[in-house]
């Protein structure tokens, strides 16, 4: 069996895809710029490659028919890198953006959305079998957004606390990816992936508190206050995108889909289950 190549395997979803493929006994090859930063199963093969330098991708692509792609490079690298990859493979599963999710949270124009659309168009024109994954809000964002405040014992200060989302566990995204990478029947399919519940951001923080066994103090920030507090830690385009999306989605429940169950036959994991599995990230 030829290995499956994972491009972008150092991130939250890529690591889970690598782990779940290895658990199934599927050989994997992980392409990354910095091999020293990788820590995977010994079953994995590691190859150095940089999407911004397409000529470095050839060694990783040797003997590869199937690729899982998480784009982790500047937009300027899209065309030359994808041309190099797509001319050598037969199947690609791309972790895209929720471009077609019928909800205001995902309909705000932004750079990430435009980049995802560009990549999809190039893949579609290549003639390869493709599958696009469109996850909504990632449950692991909670660690980035609220982890430090919760660990420190401070109040969780956050904007748009009553805006609902349907956070999805990274294990469920990976489970869908693994099916699409290893089974037939997923060519030219687009899967919208969400968690099983519409939960306000306030409710998500309260669930984390419940898992930790303590009541968390929560304070609402205005959009202006949030911008000032978030900009030191997050890029301006990300902050702008999030604030605009939360504002647009503040008056209606989150979109909850059935993509995970449809592909895997199992229900998506709840946010409570995710928080329980990641409780250590919120403890001192």
Predicted regions and their residues:
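Oxidoreductase cofactor-interface core, primarily capturing Rossmann-like NAD(P)-dependent enzymes
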Residues: 1-41, 52-55, 59-66, 73-76, ...
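Cofactor-binding loops of NAD(P)H-dependent oxidoreductases
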Residues: 49
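A hydrophobic C-terminal alpha-helical subdomain
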Residues: 224-284
């Amino acid at each position: 069996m030829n290995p499956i190549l994972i491009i972008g395997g150092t991130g939250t979803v890529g690591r889970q895809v690598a782990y779940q493929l290895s658990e199934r006994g599927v050989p994997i090859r992980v392409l990354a710029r910095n091999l020293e930063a990788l820590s995977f199963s010994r079953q994995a093969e590691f190859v150095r490659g940089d999407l911004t330098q397409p000529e470095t991708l050839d060694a990783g692509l040797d003997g590869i028919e199937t690729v899982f792609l998480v784009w982790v490079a500047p937009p300027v690298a899209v065309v030359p890198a994808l041309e190099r990859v797509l001319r050598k493979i037969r199947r690609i599963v791309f972790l895209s953006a929720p471009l077609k999710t019928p909800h205001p949270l995902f309909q705000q124009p932004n750079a990430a959305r435009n980049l995802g659309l560009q990549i999809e168009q190039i893949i579609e024109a290549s003639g390869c079998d493709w599958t696009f994954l469109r996850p909504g809000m990632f449950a692991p964002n909670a660690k980035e957004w609220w982890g430090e405040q919760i660990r420190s014992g401070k109040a969780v200060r956050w904007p748009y606390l009553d805006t609902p989302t349907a956070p999805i566990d990274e294990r469920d995204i990976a489970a869908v990816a693994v099916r699409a990478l290893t089974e037939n029947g997923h060519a030219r399919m687009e899967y919208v992936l969400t968690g099983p519940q519409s939960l306000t951001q306030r409710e998500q923080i309260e669930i984390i508190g419940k898992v930790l066994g303590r009541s968390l103090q929560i304070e609402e920030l205005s959009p202006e206050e949030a911008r000032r507090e978030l900009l030191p830690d997050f890029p301006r385009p990300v902050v702008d995108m999030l604030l605009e999306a939360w504002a647009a989605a503040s008056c209606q429940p989150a979109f909850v889909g059935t993509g995970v169950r449809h592909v895997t036959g199992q229900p998506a994991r709840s946010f409570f289950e995710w928080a329980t599995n990641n409780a250590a990230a919120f403890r001192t």
